[in-house]
Amino acid sequence: MGKTIAEKIFASHLVDEPFAGTKVLRLDVVMCHEITTPIAIADLMARGKDRVFDPTKIKAVIDHVTPSKDSKTATQAKMLRDWARRHGIVDFFDVGANGVCHALFPEKGFIRPGYTVIMGDSHTCTHGAFGAFAAGIGTTDLEVGILKGVCAFREPKTIRINLNGSLPEGVYAKDVILHVIGRIGVNGATDRVMEFRGSVVDTMTMESRMTLCNMAIEAGGTSGICMPDMVTVDYLWPFLKDEYQSREAALAAFSLWRSDEDAVYEQVLDFDVSSLEPIVTFGYKPDQVKPVSEIAGTPVDQVYLGSCTNGRLEDLRIAARILKGKKIAPTVRGILSPATPKIYQDAMREGLIDIFMEAGFCVTNPTCGACLGMSNGVLAEGEVCASTTNRNFMGRMGKGGMVHLMSPATSAATAIEGKIADPRKYL
């Protein structure tokens, strides 16, 4: 009987099986940021265990509230900063070099097919786009990961999501994943790996695959995952060229990390996206979705473009194509947060930042701040935001605020009209 990619990764990293169905895995990468990691650091220090298993396998960044907005967030940042220096963690990204973790770390080439990756952040599943098993974990597991380089997981069960057909104009990866979550629900993949397959995934860029995998957690998934292919190799090639003689050699090595044809899945779900419309959320859960045609005209106060879901260069290009030569509505605040310094610089070189600013957008430094209602775009009570982020929980971007999740294209069209709008009319 064949194995899924998740089963192969588990088998290759297995250290112990203390209980039936519980696997202790060796970790390839432990990621850390300044919101959750200081809690783990403080507990390890209190127990006299202030050490790390391997400083080369720990990647740390200050990204959630940066630069710090007050003494509390400054203290959190300092704690992570001091810890990284104390333990010789070279891959630490401080103010000026920092970006949103789930965009920055792939950009740095830290992820490979077949890797095991953890972080005290629920959207760690993003990195499954590279054919890795990547999962968000709690403080206790993070402490063990930092200290021992291992983490315990349940035996993986996989739901195969076949995405077939071809994407219509104006429809993107964000629309696809919102559609999938709308179909299966916020608990539809609880404790499962969501394996994304099909012709649509095959033709997606790595940026789009990261958008898909990023929101696996919004359906309850432990991780999202895609099969590594030449798209993966091309993205990683600047970091692989000293390890492999050719791209073809790298692809051959990565082909080990693909699900077998006779692998057994808990479920197989088929989606034909050929007639899919742009999708927008309407409530306080990511599975409350509607086609844009059914919600168009809803007024908004703010449009936010950024985050680990849709703050990459591809996303900025899509939105800028719609915004070029236009102005946002006078009733709307437009905020753009490129996800990393490199994305920001590349967008400047391409003239994208000029397009956003001429349209009336405020452009901030790379940060997660607005997404979780902490800085750089917090909503007032009763305000409504059209956002390219990944969560629309009540008060997520500010107490009493409402969030409509959508693609960068839909957010750009919405900014122009001051109300939720169909981007296809601008393409």
Swiss-Prot record:
CDD domains membership: IPMI
InterPro entries tied to this protein: Acnase/IPM_dHydase_lsu_aba_1/3 (IPR015931), Acoase/IPM_deHydtase_lsu_aba (IPR001030), Aconitase_4Fe-4S_BS (IPR018136), Aconitase_4Fe-4S_dom (IPR036008), HAcnase/IPMdehydase_lsu_prok (IPR011826), Homoacnase/IPMdehydase_lsu (IPR006251), IPM_dehydratase_rel_enz (IPR050067), IPMI_cat (IPR033941)
Annotated GO biological process: L-leucine biosynthetic process
Cofactor(s) recorded in Swiss-Prot or TrEMBL: [4Fe-4S] cluster
Co-factor note (free text): Binds 1 [4Fe-4S] cluster per subunit.
HAMAP family: LeuC_type2 (MF_01027)
Protein name as catalogued: 3-isopropylmalate dehydratase large subunit
Organism, scientific name: Geobacter sulfurreducens (strain ATCC 51573 / DSM 12127 / PCA)
